[in-house]
């Protein structure tokens, strides 16, 4: 089934609102195996909408129109679709009853004739009840093309799609997806390594997406069941993770988790809870961002002892008891300072782990180090590890954000090695 989404509303074309409905619809249709080939926005104009319907009817088997179902004069979607199909508009009894109840409960509201339009559907259409609003939707098949009209407000459209439309469209295979998350490898390198798999993909498919500091791979397949999909996705996942970088490192070393909502921070917090271990932090360039990220998760009082924000040399010395002369000798941006910050954070809070971040966020260099130079220390029973990362060519905010991601990844690896 080839689907097309037509968003009706001049406010979309003028940029007054963002068409989030198209994204939502495309995602939900993909989940049931319906491919969206076209997305279009058109203003509140009958002539242009008629022209677009003519084009859509020739190239798509499912045409979904969103918006323009309200009571005002510029709400003309149903009227225009009826004219295009040569059909009349009729009243849906359930929608009329909902209008009656709505105005009966609001005696101060004037029930003007244009309000009745919200209860109309194209003749022959299956009504799609509106759970949160008054404008009824509809689904109608004519000459092999299925036409659907949906309200524009997302609060009305989403429940109508989830509870009314999708169950009526679901036939055959569905689309199942799995998201792999990678850190420490760039999109260009990952795509180059996986070039053969990407170039020769049919089903299942894989698609890379770059985000700040990380890369995700979406694996998708059409199948009749989750079990069938898992078999296909497992094979592709293993093919991906068995690949190696140019340096001979397995991609398994860079894959840290699954899913849209997973993050390095969430992985670390859950693993600390599972192992019953605690962590403390001492931060310089990130100014508490690591600690704030930990605190975003509920129940972290069991794993997060506290921390220090020591931006200046003086505060590093005062709060962490690191001799100022040693800091001056080695520099605040150094392996020595990262080591001592991590060790003192751990010691002072009696935590299992002490993490530290010190470096150059920008825009100016510091102590001869270019912007993006970051030292991260991790102190634990087995000793202290310090890594140096270079996050060049980024904004100040990105340097700090990615530095925190590196810190979480360092903790993650330590937890997994235990």
UniProtKB/Swiss-Prot annotation:
CDD domains: cinA
Pfam family, one: CinA_KH
Highest taxon, organism lineage: Bacteria
InterPro entries found in the cross-reference section: CinA (IPR050101), CinA-like_C (IPR036653), CinA_C (IPR008136), CinA_KH (IPR041424), Competence-induced_CinA (IPR008135), MoaB/Mog-like_dom_sf (IPR036425), MoaB/Mog_dom (IPR001453)
Record SMART domains: MoCF_biosynth
Family: Belongs to the CinA family.
Record protein name field: Putative competence-damage inducible protein
């Amino acid at each position: 089934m080839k689907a097309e989404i037509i968003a009706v509303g001049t406010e979309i074309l003028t940029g007054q609102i963002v068409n989030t409905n198209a994204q939502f619809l495309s995602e939900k249709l993909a989940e049931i195996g319906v491919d969206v080939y076209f997305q279009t926005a058109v203003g509140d104009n009958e002539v242009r909408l008629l022209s677009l319907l003519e084009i859509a009817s020739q190239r798509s088997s499912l045409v979904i129109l969103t918006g323009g179902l309200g009571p005002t004069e510029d709400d003309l979607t149903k009227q225009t679709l009826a004219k295009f199909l040569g059909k009349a508009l009729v009243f849906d009894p359930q929608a009329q009853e909902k209008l009656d109840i709505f105005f009966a409960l609001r005696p101060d509201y004037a029930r003007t004739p244009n309000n009745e339009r919200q209860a109309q559907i194209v003749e022959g259409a299956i009504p799609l009840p509106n759970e949160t609003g008054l404008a009824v939707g509809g689904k109608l098949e004519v000459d092999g093309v299925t036409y659907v009209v949906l309200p524009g407000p997302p609060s009305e459209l989403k429940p109508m799609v989830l509870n009314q439309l999708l169950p009526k469209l679901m036939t055959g295979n569905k689309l199942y997806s799995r998201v792999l998350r990678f850190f420490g490898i760039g999109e260009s390198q990952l795509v180059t390594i996986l070039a053969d798999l990407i170039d020769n993909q049919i089903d299942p498919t894989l698609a890379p997406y770059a985000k700040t500091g990380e890369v995700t791979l979406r694996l998708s397949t059409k199948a009749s069941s989750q079990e069938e999909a898992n078999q296909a996705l497992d094979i592709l996942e293993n093919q991906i993770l068995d690949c190696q970088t140019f340096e001979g490192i397995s991609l398994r070393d860079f894959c840290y988790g699954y899913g849209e909502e997973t993050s390095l921070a969430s992985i670390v917090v859950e693993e600390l809870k599972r192992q019953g271990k605690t962590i403390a932090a001492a931060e310089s360039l990130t100014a508490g961002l690591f600690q704030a990220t930990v605190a975003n998760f509920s129940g972290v009082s069991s794993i997060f002892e506290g921390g220090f924000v020591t931006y200046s040399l003086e505060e590093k010395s005062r709060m962490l008891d690191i001799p100022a002369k040693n800091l001056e000798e080695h520099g605040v941006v150094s392996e020595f300072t990262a080591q001592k910050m991590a060790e003192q954070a751990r010691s002072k809070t009696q935590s299992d782990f002490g993490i530290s971040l010190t470096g150059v966020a920008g825009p100016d260099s510091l102590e001869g180090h270019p912007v993006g130079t970051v030292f991260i220390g991790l102190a634990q029973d087995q000793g202290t590890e310090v890594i140096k990362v270079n996050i060049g060519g980024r904004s100040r905010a990105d340097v700090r954000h990615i530095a925190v991601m590196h810190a979480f990844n360092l903790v993650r690896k330590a937890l997994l090695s235990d």
